[in-house]
Curated annotation (Swiss-Prot):
Function of the molecule: Intermediate capsid protein that self assembles to form an icosahedral capsid with a T=13 symmetry, which consists of 230 trimers of VP6, with channels at each of its five-fold vertices. This capsid constitutes the middle concentric layer of the viral mature particle. The innermost VP2 capsid and the intermediate VP6 capsid remain intact following cell entry to protect the dsRNA from degradation and to prevent unfavorable antiviral responses in the host cell during all the replication cycle of the virus.
Subunit structure: Homotrimer. Interacts with the inner capsid protein VP2. Interacts with the outer capsid glycoprotein VP7. Interacts with the outer capsid protein VP5*.
Binding locations of Ca(2+): 266, 286
The organism's taxonomic lineage, starting at the top: Viruses, Riboviria, Orthornavirae, Duplornaviricota, Resentoviricetes
SUPFAM superfamilies on file: A virus capsid protein alpha-helical domain, Viral protein domain
Region of interest called Interaction with the inner capsid protein VP2, as start-end residue ranges on this chain: 62-73
Origin: domain of life: Viruses
Modification after translation: The N-terminus is blocked. Sumoylated with SUMO1 and SUMO2. Sumoylation of viral proteins seems to have a positive role on viral replication.
Gene Ontology cellular component terms for the protein in this record: T=13 icosahedral viral capsid; viral envelope; viral intermediate capsid
Species name: Rotavirus A (strain RVA/Monkey/United States/RRV/1975/G3P5B[3]) (RV-A)
Name of the protein this chain belongs to: Intermediate capsid protein VP6
Annotated InterPro entries: Capsid_hemagglutn, Rotavirus_A/C_VP6, Virus_capsid_a-hlx_vir
GO biological process annotation, one example: fusion of virus membrane with host plasma membrane
Entry keywords, A to Z: Calcium, Capsid protein, Intermediate capsid protein, Metal-binding, Ubl conjugation, Virion, Zinc
Subcellular location per the Swiss-Prot or TrEMBL entry: Virion
Amino acid sequence: MDVLYSLSKTLKDARDKIVEGTLYSNVSDLIQQFNQMIITMNGNEFQTGGIGNLPIRNWNFDFGLLGTTLLNLDANYVETARNTIDYFVDFVDNVCMDEMVRESQRNGIAPQSDSLRKLSGIKFKRINFDNSSEYIENWNLQNRRQRTGFTFHKPNIFPYSASFTLNRSQPAHDNLMGTMWLNAGSEIQVAGFDYSCAINAPANIQQFEHIVQLRRVLTTATITLLPDAERFSFPRVINSADGATTWYFNPVILRPNNVEVEFLLNGQIINTYQARFGTIIARNFDTIRLSFQLMRPPNMTPAVAALFPNAQPFEHHATVGLTLRIESAVCESVLADASKTMLANVTSVRQEYAIPVGPVFPPGMNWTDLITNYSPSREDNLQRVFTVASIRSMLVK
């Protein structure tokens, strides 16, 4: 894997810097590295593809070295280099695709394609000169079963979940109280509602709670907490739990009271915030507990009092909500996130070449399914294919 990364890094630098008019002295070190790559690869044969509709391709390496010059690189020099670069880039691209479409239930962190296994041989280590990639660093750590750490921006840690619970209901669905939520990606939105605006609740206060368990532990997380849930701020028709009917939700938004968010690890509270909004942090956690209250306004203007009558019918439904968004965090496991295209890269290649469903990944690389059942086997395979996708993205956008 590290050899594949170094190949890609060398080719990217060569493609960017070996251009007509450049002083040879400015790229002499790169050309020496480029020539070392050619020397190491010459005389070797590889085969890629042969799974799904990914075609079988044979690769043979027999290229001349780039020479030295005292002056600028001319058009002939650059054209010779380009022909070599293009072949090598095509080879790396196909090795990456061949690796990204394969999976294994055992030792899925190790190379799975014949071509990448061959590149792992000792003689190709002479190519290796750069392991600065976060993915390569973590792949080497995971391969040795040592602790890894990925930094993510808006990590997709929450499987998609959208539902509701009713703490008070009737067959007519005309005086409901409960919570509804939408968890997806890096965001939780939860709303508590009471059609009667807590008129019969103790002290005219309704208490709500929402608990979310993560599939992986996050550390050093930067989080945004807002006293609102905008996705639940407009009227909607909702299917009943048994699917037998529908009920109408017409929210009027109030500010939540006594808001508390707790971050827990193995059942122990690590961080707690009370009535604090905006940016907060959490050291390490695998569970988030949100609690908040809906308080009936003690003083209301006639217009507000008309929204919340003392008896039915309740045409407007008092609602309070919270939004929690994980902006960035560190995780030992690889995840999809907002700043990287690894999941899309892997999924698109598997779709384009009609790769059959294997023993590890769900059909279509469904992320909700994958993260909901994030087994060690899936973790190993996902880290490997994401590492390869990061290498491919250096050369192929």
